[in-house]
C-alpha cells in the first residue's frame, strides 16, 4: 500500500530567505552583439559586458552547490556533537557525514533526489495503482502525474533539514558567505545530529533495507515516531539554553521555506504521529525510564529484530507501548474474481486507519478507532486495464473497539458526497458511486470491499462475509 519516504525529515514547517553573498568570484568576458539596419547601410555595434560567475566550492551528485564548512563552523559543529552525546548518553563512533546547502539548493536537492529514486521505488504499474487506491478511498482526485508533482513539491518544501537513512548524510541549508552558523542553523543541526547518532547505533539503515526487501513498511511509523521525538527532545533542550534575546534572534533567522502550491492536508497526517503523539509518548518514557529506556526501545531492532519495533498504535496510546501490545495476525482469504488477479497484499496498522479517515471525520474519532485496532489485512486485485479491487479485514481489541472501528468507517462514508446512494447489501452497507464501497461487521471483524465496477461486488455477494 503506502510506501513511506526514505528520508527522515525535520518537518519544522518554517518561513525564510537565504543570503546570496558572492565568494570565489571569477571574471569572464561575454560578447553581446547588436545589429541595426537602414536602407543605405548596416551598422554592427559590439559591446563587451563583464559578468560575475561564481565557482562553487563543491557540488553534490546532482550538480547542486555545496557550501564549505569554515573552521569556526567546524568548531561549532563539534560542540553540537558533544551536546547531543551528553543528552542521548551515547557517543559518535565516527564523524558524521554532512552536506551544507543554500536554502534554494537544499530544496532543489530534496526534489531532484526524490525524482531520481522514483523509478527504482515503484515497479511497473505500482505508482498508478497507489494513486488509484487513494482516489478510491476518497483522499484525492489527482492523476498519477499530478500526484507525482504534488509529492515532489512536498519533498521540496516540507523540511528544514534531513538525515538520509541509506547514505547516512546529514543535510542542512545555511546562509552563504558566513563564517559561523547562526542560532537557527545550529538548532536544526542538533536535531539532525541526533538522527546521525541514531544511525550509528540503532541500525536504522539495516531495518529500512529489510523493510524494503520485504516490501512491507508497516513497522516504519512507530520507530520513526520515536526517532523524531528523541531528536525533538534534544533540540528543545539545546534551545532551552538560550536566553530571551538569543531566542528572539533565533526566531528571526528562520528561513523562508514555503510550498509553491496548496498541498493536500492528508499529506501531513503521518507527521502528526511523528511530531505530536511521538513526543507525548517519549515524555512518558523519559519520566519512567529516563533516556536509557528510550534508547532501549530504539535498540529493539538490533537486539530483537524487525517484529519487535514499536507500532503506530503504541505511539497513539502509550499504555499499549508499556504493555508491548502487538497487532494480531488477521487471515484474509484470496477471492476468485473474474478477469482479476491478486497483485499485492499486506497488513493494516493504526496509522493506515487515521490516514484514510481523519480528513473526513476528524482527529479524535479516527484516533479512537485506530487505538482499538486488533489487527488487519488487505488484498488488492487488478485486471488487464489497471482497474482495482480492494478487500480489507479488520479485528478489534474488544467488541466495543470493533464497533468504534465500524462506526468510524460508516461515518467516513456517510459524510462523502461522492456516493449517489447507500443500500443494504449482503449484511452490510453498500455505498454506490464512481467507486463502490461495501462496509460490514459480523461482530468479529469489520470488512470493506471497494470496486469501481458495481457488478463485481454483486458477483461476490456470497463471499463478502467470509473472506
Name each region found by the language model.
Residues 12-15:
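C-terminal motif of bacterial Sec signal peptides marking the signal peptidase cleavage site
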Residues 17-25:
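Bacterial lipoprotein signal-peptidase II cleavage site
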Residues 25-51:
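Extracellular mucin-like PTS domains
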Residues 80, 200-205, 209-253:
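Post-HExxH zinc-binding segment in Zn-dependent metallohydrolases
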Residues 106-128, 143-170:
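Catalytic zinc-binding patch centered on the HExxH motif and its immediate surroundings
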Residues 170-190, 222:
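Short pre-active-site segment immediately N-terminal to the catalytic Zn-binding motif
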Residues 262-393:
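Pan-zinc metallopeptidase signature
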Residues 386-467:
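C-terminal soluble interaction/assembly domains
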Amino acid at each position: 500500500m503506502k510506501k513511506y519516504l526514505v528520508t527522515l525529515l525535520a518537518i519544522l514547517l518554517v518561513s525564510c530567505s537565504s543570503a546570496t553573498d558572492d565568494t570565489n568570484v571569477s571574471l569572464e568576458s561575454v560578447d553581446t552583439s547588436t545589429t541595426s539596419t537602414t536602407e543605405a547601410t548596416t551598422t554592427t555595434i559590439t559591446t563587451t559586458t563583464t559578468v560575475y560567475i561564481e565557482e562553487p566550492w563543491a557540488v553534490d551528485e546532482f550538480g547542486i552547490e555545496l557550501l564549505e564548512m569554515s573552521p569556526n563552523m567546524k568548531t561549532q559543529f563539534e560542540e553540537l556533537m558533544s551536546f547531543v552525546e551528553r543528552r542521548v548518553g551515547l557517543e559518535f563512533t565516527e564523524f558524521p557525514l554532512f552536506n551544507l546547502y543554500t536554502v534554494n539548493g537544499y530544496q532543489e536537492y530534496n526534489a531532484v533526489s526524490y525524482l531520481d529514486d522514483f523509478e527504482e521505488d515503484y515497479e511497473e504499474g505500482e505508482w498508478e495503482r497507489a494513486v488509484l487506491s487513494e482516489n478510491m478511498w476518497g483522499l484525492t482526485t489527482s492523476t498519477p502525474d499530478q500526484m507525482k508533482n504534488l509529492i515532489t513539491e512536498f519533498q521540496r518544501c516540507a523540511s528544514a533539514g534531513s538525515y538520509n537513512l541509506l547514505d547516512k548524510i546529514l543535510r542542512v541549508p545555511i546562509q552563504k558567505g558566513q563564517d559561523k552558523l547562526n542560532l537557527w542553523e545550529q538548532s536544526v543541526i542538533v536535531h539532525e545530529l541526533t538522527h546521525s547518532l541514531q544511525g550509528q547505533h540503532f541500525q536504522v539503515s539495516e531495518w529500512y533495507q529489510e523493510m524494503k526487501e520485504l516490501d512491507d513498511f508497516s513497522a516504519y511509523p512507530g520507530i520513526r515516531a520515536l526517532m523524531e521525538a528523541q531528536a525533538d527532545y534534544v533540540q528543545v533542550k539545546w534551545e532551552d539554553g538560550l536566553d530571551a534575546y538569543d531566542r528572539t534572534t533565533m526566531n528571526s533567522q528562520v528561513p523562508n521555506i514555503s510550498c509553491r502550491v496548496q498541498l493536500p492536508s492528508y499529506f501531513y497526517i503521518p507527521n502528526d504521529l511523528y511530531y505530536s503523539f511521538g513526543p507525548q509518548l517519549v515524555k512518558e518514557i523519559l519520566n519512567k525510564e529516563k533516556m536509557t529506556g528510550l534508547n532501549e526501545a530504539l535498540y529493539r531492532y538490533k537486539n530483537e529484530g524487525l517484529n519487535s519495533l514499536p507500532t503506530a498504535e503504541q505511539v497513539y496510546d502509550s499504555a499499549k507501548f508499556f504493555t508491548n501490545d502487538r497487532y494480531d495476525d488477521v487471515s484474509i482469504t484470496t477471492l476468485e474474481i473474474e478477469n482479476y488477479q491478486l497483485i499485492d497484499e499486506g497488513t493494516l496498522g493504526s496509522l493506515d486507519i487515521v490516514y484514510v479517515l481523519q480528513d473526513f471525520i476528524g482527529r479524535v474519532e479516527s484516533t479512537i478507532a485506530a487505538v482499538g485496532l486488533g489487527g488487519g489485512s488487505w488484498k488488492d486485485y487488478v485486471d488487464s486495464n489497471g482497474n482495482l479491487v480492494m478487500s480489507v479485514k479488520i479485528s478489534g481489541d474488544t467488541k466495543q473497539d470493533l464497533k468504534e472501528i465500524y462506526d468510524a468507517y460508516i461515518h467516513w462514508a456517510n459524510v462523502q458526497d461522492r456516493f449517489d446512494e447507500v443500500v443494504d447489501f449482503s449484511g452490510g452497507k453498500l455505498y454506490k458511486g464512481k467507486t463502490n464501497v461495501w462496509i460490514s461487521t459480523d461482530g468479529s471483524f469489520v470488512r470493506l470491499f471497494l470496486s469501481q465496477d458495481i457488478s463485481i461486488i454483486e458477483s461476490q455477494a456470497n463471499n463478502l462475509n467470509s473472506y
